[in-house]
Amino acid sequence: MSDDVDAPDLAVGHLPRRLANRHIQLIAIGGTIGTGLFMGSGRTISHAGPAVLVVYGIVGFFLFFVLRAMGELLLSNLNYKSFVDFAADLLGPGAGFFVGWSYWFAWIITGTAEIVAITGYAKFWWPDLPAWLPALVTVALILAFNLFSVRNFGEIEFWFALIKLVAIVCFILAGAILLATHFVSPQGDPATIENLWNDGGFFATGFAGVVSGFQVATFAFVGVELVGTAAAETANPRRVLPRAINAVPLRISIFYIGALLAILVVVPWRQFASGQSPFVMMFSLAGLAAAASVVNFVVITSAASSVNSGLFSTGRTLFGLADEGSAPSPFRRLNRGGVPGPALLATAALLLTSIPLLYVHGSVIGAFTLLTIVSSLLFMFVWAMIIVSYLVYRRRHQQRHADSIYRMPAGVAMCWAVLAFFAFVIWTLSTERETAIALAWFPLWLAVLAVGWLIIRRRPRHTETYRRFQIEMNRPVDQETVELVGPR
């Protein structure tokens, strides 16, 4: 007998809350730490110099308030499964359509890019390995973990995040030991706190350098909103979600600022090239002969973590879009494990488009690089829509805000400050040729969505589905399910 008959409660139903506190805490860490910290931070240092510490701190500060706004919205109505739901409910079905499909596309591109990267990292150990094999194995394994239970996703992401966490802690400890022992590099450079200002000053690259640092640093935080995507499947979200979000500033201080501070006091900042990993340099200086292999392993797990997060996020996003009538109805179906199986399978198939990219060069790779920058812009678009949703929520649901157990600090005023910061980041993108080209292409995606929305909205079935969606969003919350505390 089919799953539809055997499991009528899951065929078209609600995502079960099976993620425990430890899963959410490590998912939040994994979302905060991207592959860019391990491989791209050298580029950020070469652009901004020691002021990179301030740049990452400012970006993290504003994104923390995006998460606080998202947290208050999700906890104000536990029928919201993600930010796509509250955007559709508060801003209208068009906003849900734009936010959902933008987030879906952003993760498809990001996941594809990470799979291409995994293939490159695998060739570090096995140079003769067929290019298609690591890509196929990665997608197959990640799909297998995600297809049967959300707890499988939580477990694998838990361990991926733990590996990144251990690597960063070891990195910081190595820097502290080298500093305490007055280490001198083979080039004759001593490890000293004075490296932060003794070569051109703290803001050595000037205003232009700091501005270019914002371009790189902002997109290093892609995935920080992942904890909101997992909210619908979190046991006891009223307790777990605030804990995960409130810990973000400390995590940014340790994982980004702490790690970058460790390398800057050991190695003069001008020695970094754009493509150089500070982690490889630090572990090599600390005497770890296998430094490159260790970092390669960490980067592969970090990239696999991103693919895992991408598959999870896109599957849930398609589920939410179908729930409100903005995606084909089969994507609203849950399998026996309580996960959106059809949505996950469709996403996995699209991720396999990474394989042809491994065999092309030239203009196609250039176009793909352009798309990855556009996908980063899409993440910022989603962050901005979270803030806009919060502004509408404050105007429309004053009582909900008054009753909220998790209010956003500084509320409306901070929302406008965050939007002003995003406008500043967009301006910084216009100052570099590569990012300016991506910025110019970005409206094309919005135009494609606009055409899709004009087609979708005319369908009577969409109107009826959205009406049912609104009823669903305003139904009484099942307190027994919400207050369930899963295993730790």
Protein language model regions, located:
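Helix-loop-helix junctions that connect adjacent transmembrane segments
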Residues: 3-15, 52-53, 127-130, 162-297
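C-terminal membrane-solvent junction of multi-pass transporters and transport-like membrane proteins
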Residues: 159-160, 331-341, 380-432
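A generic transmembrane alpha-helix motif of multi-pass inner-membrane proteins
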Residues: 179, 369, 374-382, 408-488
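Membrane-interface "cap" regions at the ends of multi-pass membrane proteins
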Residues: 1-42, 46-51, 64-68, 79-80, ...
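Helix-loop-helix connectors at the membrane interface of multi-pass transporters/channels
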Residues: 2-8, 84-88, 115-135, 167-170, ...
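Membrane-interface loop-to-helix entry segments
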Residues: 119, 133-191, 245-249, 376-385, ...
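Extracellular loop-to-transmembrane helix junctions
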Residues: 16, 39-134, 138, 248-257, ...
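TM-loop-TM module centered on a large, flexible mid-protein loop between adjacent transmembrane helices
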Residues: 85-88, 92, 124, 197-200, ...
